[in-house]
Amino acid sequence: MAVPTTAVEGVRSRGAPGEVIHLNVGGKRFSTSRQTLTWIPDSFFSSLLSGRISTLKDETGAIFIDRDPTVFAPILNFLRTKELDPRGVHGSSLLHEAQFYGLTPLVRRLQVREELDRSSCGNVLFNGYLPPPVFPVKRRNRHSLVGPQQIGGRPAPVRRSNTMPPNLGNAGLLGRMLDDRAPPSPSGQPEEPGMVRLVCGHHNWIAVAYTHFLVCYRLKEASGWQLAFSSPRLDWPIERLALTARVLGGAPGEHDKMVAAATGSEILLWALQAQGGGSEIGVFHLGVPVEALFFVGNQLIATSHTGRIGVWNAVTKHWQVQEVQPITSYDAAGSFLLLGCSNGSIYYVDVQKFPLRMKDNDLLVSELYRDPAEDGVTALSVYLTPKTSDSGNWIEIAYGTSSGVVRVIVQHPETVGSGPQLFQTFSVHRSPVTKIMLSEKHLISVCADNNHVRTWSVTRFRGMISTQPGSTPLASFKILALESADGLGGCSAGNDIGPYGERDDQQVFIQKVVPNASQLFVRLSSTGQRVCSVRSVDGSATTAFTVLECEGSRRLGSRPRRYLLTGQANGSLAMWDLTTAMDGLGQTPAGGLTEEELMDQLEQCELSPLTSSRASFPSPSPRTSLTSLHSASSNTSLCGHRGSPSPPQAGARSRGAGSFVDRFKELARGAPELRGPPTPAPRPSTSLGNPLILPKNTLNETSF
């Protein structure tokens, strides 16, 4: 049983530097000397043994410390030898414990170790950074704003570059607003009015939705991403976002670039101009909460689980609302839309060729297929095979049900009138299917059991799905993604795991494990293999993400590129090159120094305190405030590591400078104010006998 000891008793128990101290760390006993524990001033151990901190002792008299003994072992080894041997301990855990014990030299060394994998400029996949835009002050009219806006009689700064800004995440008025946080919400967490809620892309355009406004960026080949449109401030938070940037074969005068936002039952639609700016087309009402908002061609579609569907036709400029069965899923291909309903029916809507019935002015909605068990269709995916004849495409539809069943139905071009035929059935899920994807090579299904994924290989003959040998099981894995209970991790619609990508190419899942995570994992949708992981360059949490298939350059040999877009809690937007990541899949990266090699190099010097904002660890005493390796003269050899020690000067002795060997000699002469760690084993000299001249410049973390 641990017995408390008062601070006064701790002071009285001070002993000689060679006194043996017994520690009980988390139930494991350690024995070391007082000198080993106290050579770093103002640390946890020096305060403990000097009586400034009350102690607990177990039944044997050992000082009890309620910390992890596994992590304490390499820390004690560092205090003994001044060498770091992690012994399989995770770097972040070791850094956390070093900060707890107040071991400033070890903390600095571990921070440099972490810089191996972290950079404010990202990694090789980092492709661009867009700072937060200017926040619209008022909604004076229903016309949109673009470019610099007048705020207080002066133009607000708008950064129009896809490079890293000098002040990460604090450009523009929105960035400054984040410094003055709103009062805490009822859940106790601060509100994030400027975080990215939704992000979507189409061809060379990006739409980013914040709480009360949205912006659009356009990619220009020579100048990069440019701000093209900024909406006025809205009175309600944006919950859904849709963008279309190019329509092939559209009639003259049609809107070919549009962006729409919705919340509740209200939908706002804007037309975008290629040269920048935009105008409001109109405000539409669905009458019930909008749960899905998307474009099929240049037709805007809004659906609700209640069974109501709204279509805005770009040709007739007509908004039509119609009731069907309660909608539980949807998918689109070409110019037609499929709706999965709770009664097991799959409805077919051609939104371009036959938008309205001639008699009753209703949408042309027809039942395409009904599930044999009449289970609700909770996920839909349609695949159009390449056109092999004048009669049309072979239509393949995969869908999942509320009972966990996955079915594949097909329709021949010659048998359009008879409807699709059931092709395959898989009963591998015990929870409702939430996502499904039928691509050229794979069938992928996801169920509600923590995003459990099952995949199959699809065999095709002349582009059409084949029964010999049919679909074969490929992989089973999970994409764990926890959702926030208070909504502070971002809008749920902006954190869709996917799969993303064209159906004739490799598709990927995007995994954000916890709501406030700053790191995303990109995994192949077919096997679950990790493609890469990206971490926000400014350290802010990622609140929304999507994958953009961007058009290639007009230059010879260029090809389309695939980008991962991540919206951050501070309002910024980062872009990552997934094409490069996919090309390097399976290759072993050739790096520079390993962590062990870096630690070996850092043992040859003392690190000065960080002057940047990334570390704020004050130096408690002059001995730990060394900004460089001090020496008595410019030709002094490096003591304590290699060579022979030179006699210390009196001035250096009074300041506590010199190598720890010099300080150890002073300690042996009886100087109580000079303490150092035990002398480590001498290192073999790599020189040819010439002394190493100490560097004149300050060594700090940025030197490595």
Swiss-Prot record:
UniProt WD repeat ranges: 233-280, 283-322, 324-359, 428-466, 548-586
GO molecular function: identical protein binding
Short sequence motif PXXXPR: positions: 618-623, 678-683
Superkingdom in the source lineage: Eukaryota
BTB domain segment(s): 19-88
Modified residues (Phosphothreonine): 163
Major location category of this protein: other
Keywords associated with the record: Acetylation, Lysosome, Phosphoprotein, Repeat, WD repeat
Residue numbers of N-acetylalanine PTMs: 2
Biased composition, class Low complexity, residue ranges: 611-631
Positions of region (Disordered): 146-165, 609-704
Role description: Inhibits CBL-SH3KBP1 complex mediated down-regulation of EGFR signaling by sequestration of SH3KBP1. Binds to SH3KBP1 and prevents its interaction with CBL and inhibits translocation of SH3KBP1 to EGFR containing vesicles upon EGF stimulation.
Family: Belongs to the KCTD3 family.
UniProt-recorded name of the protein: SH3KBP1-binding protein 1
Biological source species: Rattus norvegicus (Rat)
Phylogenetic lineage: Eukaryota, Metazoa, Chordata, Craniata, Vertebrata
Name of the encoding gene: Shkbp1
